[in-house]
């Protein structure tokens, strides 16, 4: 082989982000994002370890988890017969945020409102881009040097009844260390 190793699967991640300043101001911006992930065997029949699959929900600070605010960490996606999340081979998510800079000096403070939709699917054949779990919410971001970004979000997951059988409610999410 060209490179050493015995991995017989391919995991592909795609992310597109777009920022647009609004009202000719450096204090108001629109941020949009689209995430897509796919994992499959190169050699058919090769087992893929469960930690390599895609998981979704929460703030995304849990390893290998696509963030979807308004839902618990790793709560969105395929489940086994006893209701445990098993992860999926396909992840898709879109989102939009409207960001407002309250202060830029000495410590930048931003307020935001967001809308997101996403899901994890067992396989490419079972992927349905119209079967998304939706959420909206509000948040705040502080950019503290040299610590980095600290964020607080309240998200409302409209489809929690489908995801975990519970009524929709506002959930708090803490962000740390990720930039805009």
Give the role of each language-model region:
Residues 1-108, 113-114, 121-123, 161-165, ...:
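C-terminal outer-membrane beta-barrel translocator/porin domains of Gram-negative envelope proteins
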Residues 87, 143-145, 167:
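Surface-exposed coil/turn segments at beta-strand junctions on protein surfaces, enriched
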Residues 97-99, 135-141:
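Short glycine-rich, acidic/polar surface loops and turns
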Residues 111, 143-144, 150, 179:
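Flexible, small/polar- and glycine-enriched "cap/hinge" segments at structural transition points
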Residues 128-131:
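C-terminal soluble interaction/assembly domains
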Residues 155-160:
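A short, acidic, flexible beta-alpha connecting loop/helix-capping segment that sits on the rim
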């Amino acid at each position: 082989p060209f490179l050493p190793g015995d991995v017989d699967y391919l995991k592909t991640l795609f992310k597109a982000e777009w920022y647009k300043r609004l009202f000719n101001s450096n204090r108001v911006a629109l941020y949009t994002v689209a995430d897509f992930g796919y994992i499959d065997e190169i050699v058919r029949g090769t087992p893929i370890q469960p930690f390599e699959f895609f998981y979704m929900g929460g703030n995304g600070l849990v390893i290998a988890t696509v963030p979807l605010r308004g839902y618990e960490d790793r709560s969105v996606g395929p489940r086994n017969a006893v209701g445990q999340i098993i992860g999926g081979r396909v992840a898709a998510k879109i989102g939009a945020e409207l960001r407002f800079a309250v202060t830029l000096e000495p410590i930048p403070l931003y307020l935001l409102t967001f809308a997101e939709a996403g899901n994890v699917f067992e396989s490419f054949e079972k992927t349905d881009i119209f079967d998304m779990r939706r959420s909206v919410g509000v948040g705040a971001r502080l950019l503290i040097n040299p610590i980095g970004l600290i964020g607080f979000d309240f998200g409302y997951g409209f489809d929690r009844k489908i995801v975990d059988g519970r009524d929709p409610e506002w959930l708090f999410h803490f962000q740390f260390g990720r930039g805009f």
